[in-house]
């Protein structure tokens, strides 16, 4: 109701062969599912994770443990020793600590940043276009030597190369806007933390072309200076505080979740205009020497709506993972050419994914067909009215009936993954529809005297049946029972007190049964009731 949260799940992860395109959606709203997935294809192990669960560092640590345990089980007969990767005495609490809250300082003064609109790559792919993944490798040693020759880090060198690769696709008019990259920063390197939850910030190096100094060396020098000025502890703390201050705001904290989601989406849309592309360096992945002999490389890439370059290295192999949903791959081509000009030998890996498994949109197709049928029924009824009986407007009732059916089916489709939430929404919609039909047919009061109380009782019975059939735990059904019971008590009670209801029996029965359901939850499921109320409202 007010915020997103993570909760423990009894679901067991199942390892299976890769069956869908890389970086497919893991989080489906209202669907109870894990936020990570482990698959394999030939000699490759895949670990995909939803970003709300962890960041690149946390995902890397999990993958290291996963690979280590797999190799140990596969080769222990050959004498492979079992080793510990995690630090000694590292507890679950250490790994689940919220480091953002730990290092948040409300007294730290905020630094105002001038927001600049960045150049945007315009060549978008088609709707539902598959994610384009291009993976390349090169020698860490060779690239590191070149970076040292310039007096910069590998990240700075690749950032400058990426900016220049994008610039090559820009026109003179487009040079009015700078090329700006978002570069995530692992805050654990600045603020000590063993948390495996998200703990990262970001910086936004860029370059304004068109000033006469547009060579690679000019861009590299500007990026180098930006990194030096913006990777300080003070600067990153200020950036971190800006974000956490919004979460900690006493008024915004209690804003409805739906309102927050809309504001966040609007803010994200505006923030997109400040960034051209993303470069993420996951740094070095280390494995024990005994295990390293069985590993060829580590690679990383992320789902994105723009162009993103992810980097990680293992031993002397640097893996570059480009992901994009744009039609053009010219930027990637330019980037590889720049690296070759710097003396790096770039090897483009052959795609080794299974046959494309496109998303299944059959459910959406059914809703589209039903929508067309509803519109067709309304149009046909209007034509019939005009041709056969101009003075009678049966089409109005047909339109109202179609709208009623379409609304209930559309909500049912959207909320299909959570039947109890579906029922809660249907309770609200059907109550409103009853009143509208009563008003539209000449108010007789049947909607409030009989309709609403009966709907309230029916929905509560349906919820009980769903919970029984699906063997739902109290944690899964509690909030929906409470919402339905409270709604079914308060609304009929208000209608009774205000004198709107003239036939009292259905409303009295509805209020009494709803009250008993609520009391039963409090008495017999007290612990679960308090836990859910605290989780949803931070009370109790």
Features from the language model and the residues they span:
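Central hydrophobic cores of alpha-helical transmembrane segments
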Residues: 160, 223, 423-430, 478-489
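Hydrophobic alpha-helical membrane segments
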Residues: 455-466, 476-497
